[in-house]
């Protein structure tokens, strides 16, 4: 782990979760009420604190991902294919994304709307994501160490010495100035854990279920871990933009125009031919498809031009969106 204890509220104000490290090279500790009380007192700083131990178990930081997520009729997801520390908050998100990716594909195959080869794309699309998020979460743990080093908290666990090291940063000496600079740099680097929007938002699928039609993948203009770069390039998640109901003025996200068990075609004025062609193909294949022509005097209007800025096609072009809300 990161070498630091944790106290987290479960229910205010009388139920708490405490995380405490132990040496994995030795035996697992027996977490008795006496042991747990000692840990709680040390973390909170109250030598007379009394607790009621509800439950205890041991857990080890994992650095594990599956390179293959399916085999025959067996499909795995969630913790079965990626296990990692809680850094970056990627656990539940990624598990839900796994199921979201697989569910609509299974439904189409079971309904006879797609061949079984569609299920191969689950492995092709999600296995690289498993590797990516496990790598990122474990890297974030390693990036915590410089903070403790800069604070002088890596030289033992004596509380008096630790407090002395912390107070040293308040001195007017050159050494204290260097310490303050080291602290600033170490904390700033944690943006890769707490502000890394691109880690998830920039994920792009590549599989036989994605048709690029020869389009060149857009390069990332900024750090792809930190900064989300909206794109409708096939395989990327559909960008959010507010569009407005012509009749009521209510705002609706482009994300909410899509999904709901249907493929979606988004186009603008002059894109009627795309609508006719897509609806004909959908009818022939027996699949659900919803079309939206976004523009003036249409059911949905792009008043602020937000959709026009991120769609990467002209008014007369189109974006075809999977049931899972990725461009395809």
Residue ranges and their predicted role:
Residues 1-175, 203:
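Core Rossmann-like FAD-binding/catalytic domain of the broad FAD-dependent monooxygenase superfamily
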Residues 38, 42, 108-327:
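Helical substrate-recognition/capping region of FAD-dependent monooxygenase/halogenase enzymes
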């Amino acid at each position: 782990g990161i070498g630091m204890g944790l106290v987290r509220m479960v229910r205010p104000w009388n139920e708490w979760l405490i995380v405490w490290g132990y040496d994995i090279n030795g035996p697992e500790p027996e977490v008795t009420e006496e042991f747990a009380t000692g840990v709680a007192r040390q973390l909170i700083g109250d030598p007379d604190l009394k607790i009621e131990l509800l439950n205890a178990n041991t857990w080890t930081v994992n650095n594990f991902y599956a390179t293959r997520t399916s085999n025959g009729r067996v499909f795995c997801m969630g913790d079965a294919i990626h296990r990692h520390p809680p850094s970056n908050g990627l656990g539940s998100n990624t598990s839900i994304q796994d199921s979201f990716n697989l569910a609509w594909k299974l439904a189409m195959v079971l309904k006879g709307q797609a061949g079984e080869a569609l299920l191969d794309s689950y492995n092709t699309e999600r296995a690289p994501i498993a590797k990516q998020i496990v790598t990122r979460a474990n890297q974030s743990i390693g990036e915590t160490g410089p903070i403790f080093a800069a604070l002088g908290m890596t030289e033992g666990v004596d509380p008096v010495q630790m407090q002395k090291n912390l107070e040293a940063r308040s001195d007017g000496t050159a050494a204290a100035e260097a310490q303050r600079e080291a602290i600033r740099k170490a904390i700033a680097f944690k943006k890769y854990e707490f502000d890394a929007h691109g880690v998830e938002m920039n994920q792009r699928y590549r599989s036989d279920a994605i048709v690029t039609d020869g389009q060149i993948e857009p390069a990332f203009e900024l750090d792809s871990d930190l900064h989300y770069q909206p794109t409708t390039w096939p395989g990327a998640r559909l960008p959010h933009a507010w569009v407005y109901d012509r009749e009521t003025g209510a705002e609706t996200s482009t994300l909410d125009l899509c999904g709901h068990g249907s493929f979606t075609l988004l186009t603008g004025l002059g894109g009627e031919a795309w609508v006719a062609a897509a609806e004909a193909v959908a009818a022939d294949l027996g699949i659900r498809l919803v079309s939206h022509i976004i523009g003036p005097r249409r059911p949905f209007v792009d008043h602020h031009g937000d959709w026009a800025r991120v769609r990467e096609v002209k008014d007369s072009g189109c974006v075809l969106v999977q049931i899972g809300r990725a461009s395809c």
